[in-house]
Amino acid sequence: MSSPPLHGLSSVGHLSRDPPPRSWSPRDKCSYLGLSHGNLRVHYKGHGKTSKDAASVRSTHPIPAACGIFYFEVKIISKGRDGYMGIGLSTQGVNLNRLPGWDKHSYGYHGDDGHSFCSSGTGQPYGPTFTTGDVIGCCVNLIDNTCFYTKNGHSLGIAFTDLPPNLYPTVGLQTPGEVVDANFGQSPFVFDIEDYIREWRSKIQAQIERFPVAGEWQSMIQRMVSSYLVHHGYCSTAEAFAKSTDQTVQEELASIKNRQRIQKLVLSGRMGEAIETTQQLYPSLLERNPNLLFTLKVRQFIEMVNGTDSEVRCLGNRSLKSPDGCLGSDSNCSNGIISNKAHQTHCHSKSQSSNLNVTELNSINMTMSHQLNSYSSNDVEMETDHYSNGFSASTSNGFLNGSSRHEPELEECDTEMEVDTSHGRRQLCGGSQAAVERMICFGRELQAMSEQLRRERGKNATNKNMLKDAFSLLAYSDPWNSPVGYQLDPIQREHVCSSLNSAILDIHNLPKQPPLSLALEQASQCLEMMAQCGIGSCAFARVADYLH
C-alpha cells in the first residue's frame, strides 16, 4: 500500500492554481443523499423504489488538468438493499437525480452488474461486480484523457477514452442502506498509484529528451552560459569558460570586476560604500535613476538599523575608542562615507557610546514616529536651516550622497554587532548612541529626498510604502523580531543588488537579464500556459529537474 499524503496530486500538481477535489460537496448533491465524516461518507436516505430515486453527489472542485494524473478510491461500507451503486465522473450541470454514466458527459462503473456507462443508459461489460468491503478506485489520466478503475488494488483496464475537461469525481446510490466512504488522498490507497505515475513521468521525460534541436544548440547554450557568468560578475569563471569554449567575453574584465565589487558591498550590507563606489565608477548612473538611488538609500537606512552599514559600524568603532565618538572628531569615517560637514549640519550633539536604555529607545521611536506622520501629509514643510530645496546642504547633485566626495583608502570597519548581554538580544545600530543619532539624521535626509522626488516626479506608492516600512522598524524595541523585521533579513539585499546590477549593465548596452534566465522563465511560463489550457503532460515537466 502506498502512503503519500493527499496522494492524487501531491507529486504532480506543482503547476495547479485550482484546488483539487478533497471531499463531496454538500451544495452539489441530490437531496436523497446525506453526508458525514467530513463530507467523505455518503449514505442513501431516499425510498429506492425506482430508477427515479437514484441520487448522486459531486466533489467540491473539478480535477485540475495541471495535476496530470488524479486518483481517488471509494470503499463500500454497505451495499444496502440492492447494491445499485455507481462510481465515476461528471461535468458540472449533469442531472444529480441519476447514477453516474447515464447522461451526457457522465461516466460510471456500477456495482450491481459490473458494467461501465459512458453518457448512456445502456452499459457495456467492463469488470466484476462489487459489494460490501470492496474498494473501488478511479484514475483519470489527463495526459491521454482516459480513465481506468481498480478493485481492491488491481487495475481493471481502460474504461473510458476521449474524456472532456473539468470533470468532477461523482458517486451515486439508489437503494436504502447503501453507504460509501471516499478517500481523496487523506489515507493510504489500496492501489499502488505511484508505479503508474512513475511510468508516465518516464514517458514524458523521454519525449522531452527526444525532441529535435537545431545543429547549433551547443554553441548557443555556451553563449548563454557565458553571458550568465558575465551578468553575475563571476569574472574568473567567465574568463576560464570563454577560453575553454573559444569565445570572447562580451564585457571588459575590468567592468565585470567593478560590478562584482559593488555586488559584494550590497550583499554584505555595506550600502554606503556601495553607493559611493557606484558614483565613483558610474558618475551619471544614479543621477539619471533617482528612484533607484532612493531604493539604495532606503536599504542603507535599514542596514543602519541592522548595524551593518559601514557608516554606523565606523561610528561604533570610534565611539568605543574615543569618549566623544565619531561625531566629535575632526576626521571623516572610512572611505568618506560620513563627512564632518554633514554632522555639523544635522547632528549638533556629542554622545558617548552606550547600550540604549528604554528611555532612549522610546525617544528614538517618538522621533521617527513624528517623521512617519509628517511623511503621510501632503503638505510637509522641511526645516530651512537643515535643507536647501528639500535636500541636505551636504548633497552635491540634488540628492543626498550619504558620503564625502573624498576618495581615501578603504578602511575596514568589520566589528561585530554589539549585543546587549543583559537582555541577550541585538541592539539598534549595534548599540552605539552616536550611530543611532546619525541614523536619525539620515532618516530625515531620506525623507527630504522622498519629498523632492514626489514634487519633481509625482506620487510613487512604491517609494512611499518602502520608506514607511523602513521607518516602521523603529516602532519596535526589538525590530528583528517584529512584524516588519523581515526587512533586516540579508536575503532582502538580493533584489536591491539585482536592480543596481541591471542598471549598470544597461548603460553598457548589455541585457538587464541574462538570456539563460529569460529562457528558463519562458519555459516556466509555457508550462503554466499548458496547465491553463488543460494539457496534462505539463505535470511531469519541471524546469528544476533539468538544472542539476
From Swiss-Prot:
Sequence ranges assigned to domain LisH in this UniProt record: 217-249
A GO biological process held by the record: cytoskeleton organization
GO CC aspect terms: cytoplasm; nucleus; plasma membrane
Keyword field contains Glycoprotein: no
Gene3D superfamilies in the record: 2.60.120.920
Positions of the CTLH domain: 255-312
Membrane-topology annotation of the record: Peripheral membrane protein
InterPro entries named in the record: B30.2/SPRY (IPR001870), B30.2/SPRY_sf (IPR043136), ConA-like_dom_sf (IPR013320), CRA_dom (IPR013144), CTLH/CRA (IPR024964), CTLH_C (IPR006595), LisH (IPR006594), SPRY_dom (IPR003877)
Coiled coil: none
Keywords from the named record: Cell membrane, Cytoplasm, Membrane, Nucleus
Positions of region (Disordered): 1-23
Compartment list: Cytoplasm; Cell membrane; Nucleus
Domain B30.2/SPRY: 2-189
SMART domains: CRA (SM00757), CTLH (SM00668), LisH (SM00667), SPRY (SM00449)
Function description: May act as scaffolding protein, and as adapter protein to couple membrane receptors to intracellular signaling pathways. Acts as a mediator of cell spreading and actin cytoskeleton rearrangement. Core component of the CTLH E3 ubiquitin-protein ligase complex that mediates ubiquitination and subsequent proteasomal degradation of target proteins.
Subunit record text: Identified in the CTLH complex that contains at least MAEA, RMND5A (or alternatively its paralog RMND5B), GID8, WDR26, and RANBP9 and/or RANBP10.
Family designation: Belongs to the RANBP9/10 family.
Protein name, as recorded: Ran-binding protein 9
Organism: Xenopus laevis
Organism taxonomic ancestry: Eukaryota, Metazoa, Chordata, Craniata, Vertebrata
Gene coding for it: ranbp9
